Regions:
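Short amphipathic alpha-helix segments
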Residues: 107-129
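DNA replication initiation on ssDNA origins
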Residues: 1-99, 127
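Short beta-strand
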Residues: 133-140, 171-176
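Long, compositionally biased, charged low-complexity segments
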Residues: 39-44, 60-69, 117-122, 204-216
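DNA replication initiation modules
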Residues: 6-14, 82-109, 149-230, 235-239
Length: 242
């Protein structure tokens, strides 16, 4: 059966930050492959000049680069659909939860080491085996690591555990259901699994939802858990065979 992908995305430059629309992966690809986005990324990184900005005025250049970054198209990695296309936490549709999250590496000096470490974790025998879904340079040439969440673990628990394994600081701003990520150009994409932004097989979705429900959470892992995540994950790894 062909894998279905769904992305909650605002594909427009200067798009309303409160609006996202559900498309398949083709729209995502058209955005990152566009000449316009490539030029914006080059300007943000200082590889191309910005029209009307004095290159000798460092403050003006920085301000213009920040403005351009804020104008980039963006997507939401945690959910494929938002009710009425409104990007708000309460509008994230539980049934569209993608069981994936994005780790931020904000230390430029650690980016290449983080790429190597992410690949190492992906091949390890622990809970991160097979977890790597996406590697991509951010607009500022830092790093976004897309990973599959271990069964039964919430976004917050996944972020904390993976950041510890990776050796980078945990950032609580990365765990909100409505989190948005600015898109970068195709050349910034280092690796993509075919399961990035994919709808999982129904049997796996049901097993993952049950894992959350058994912890006293919602089907998308929200709420106050009654069972420790590590204990539950260890006891539940046999539920899923990918």
């Amino acid at each position: 059966m062909e894998t279905v992908h769904v992305v909650a995305i605002n594909p427009y430059r200067k798009g309303n930050k409160g609006k996202v629309f559900s498309y398949n992966i083709d729209t995502y690809d058209k955005v990152i492959e566009s000449a316009a986005v490539k030029k914006m990324i080059q300007q943000i990184r200082g590889e191309l000049p910005i029209d009307g900005v004095d290159l000798n005025d460092a403050q003006a250049v920085k301000k213009a680069q920040e403005r351009l970054k804020s104008e980039l198209p963006f997507f939401c990695p945690h959910y494929g659909m938002f009710k009425n296309n409104v990007r708000r936490q309460e509008n994230a549709m539980p049934e569209s939860f993608l069981f994936q999250t994005i780790i931020d590496v904000d230390d430029k000096e650690y980016v290449e080491k983080a790429i190597e470490k992410a690949r190492e974790l992906n091949c390890s025998s622990g809970i991160w085996n097979g977890s790597l879904l996406h590697l991509c340079y951010s607009a500022r040439k830092k790093l976004h690591i897309g990973i599959r969440m271990p069964i039964g673990m919430t976004i917050e628990e996944t972020q904390k555990a993976y950041c510890e394994a990776l050796g980078v600081p945990y950032d609580e701003s990365c765990i909100t259901p409505e989190r948005m990520i600015f898109l970068t150009d195709k050349d910034s994409e280092i690796y993509r699994s075919k399961m990035w932004c994919a709808v999982l097989p129904e049997s796996e979705i049901q097993a993952r939802r049950k894992a959350f429900l058994d912890r006293g959470l919602t089907v998308d892992g929200r709420g106050d858990a009654k069972v420790n995540s590590l204990q539950f994950t260890v006891n539940s790894l046999s539920l899923i065979h990918i």
